[in-house]
Amino acid sequence: MADTTGRIPLWLISTVTGTLVIGLMGIFFYGSYSGLGSSL
């Protein structure tokens, strides 16, 4: 794992990005559904 220093694996980037996107979409949809999204 020493050769990956300073370089992030592509699968890790895609996994983290996908998780963040799904999480943010879920939060926004839940917020708008429960009426709290208007404050954002």
Curated annotation (Swiss-Prot):
Keyword Chloroplast: yes
Chain ranges passing through the membrane: 8-28
Residues in the signal sequence: none
Gene Ontology CC terms, in alphabetical order: chloroplast thylakoid membrane; photosystem II reaction center
Pfam families xrefs: PsbJ (PF01788)
Record key words, sorted: Chloroplast, Membrane, Photosynthesis, Photosystem II, Plastid, Reaction center, Thylakoid, Transmembrane, Transmembrane helix
GO biological process, one term: photosynthesis
Entries under NCBIfam families matching the protein: PRK02565.1 (NF002722)
Summary of subunit composition and partner proteins: PSII is composed of 1 copy each of membrane proteins PsbA, PsbB, PsbC, PsbD, PsbE, PsbF, PsbH, PsbI, PsbJ, PsbK, PsbL, PsbM, PsbT, PsbX, PsbY, PsbZ, Psb30/Ycf12, at least 3 peripheral proteins of the oxygen-evolving complex and a large number of cofactors. It forms dimeric complexes.
Entry's family note: Belongs to the PsbJ family.
PANTHER family linked: PHOTOSYSTEM II REACTION CENTER PROTEIN J (PTHR34812:SF3)
Protein name per UniProt: Photosystem II reaction center protein J
Source organism: Ginkgo biloba (Ginkgo)
Taxonomy of the source species: Eukaryota, Viridiplantae, Streptophyta, Embryophyta, Tracheophyta
